[in-house]
Amino acid sequence: VTTSRREHLVVHALLGSHGTTVTARRHELTIDEAPRYGGHDSGANPVEHMLAGLAAASLVVLRLLGEVALAESATLTVSASVNVGRVMGTDDGAAIEMIRLDWHVANAEHAERLRAALPHLARRRPGQALIDAASISTEGVSIRELTTAGE
């Protein structure tokens, strides 16, 4: 018998003169835009915060899948192409046109384990709908090149 557990998460946002302050539980984040979009660059922009959430959620779920050592040794870069015209109201296309998750692992065995875990990760990752809504999404795995000291 499985029981389903739900949590209700709440964040509070307050627009200030230099960005938006968002409070989640007892944690504060500053969200702002680059000056070219009318901001002061006092924090990452909203899309960067979403990408950070996807990256963190990916590593957390990988750990929850039992791949603790892999999660602790992997690095993940999440990037996206944003349709600024859509955000500004001048275009009807997808807001996020492309999203890419680039995993870097230490060796071939880790790469094989990660590739096997990716379908399970996609089913459980919070924010997967954001990835699925992008016009194009890719998730790749590569092995880090190890360098020796002095190179």
Where are these regions (language model features)?
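Alpha-helical metal-binding/catalytic segments enriched in His/Glu/Asp
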Residues: 54-58
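Extended beta-strand/beta-hairpin segments
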Residues: 1-52, 62-151
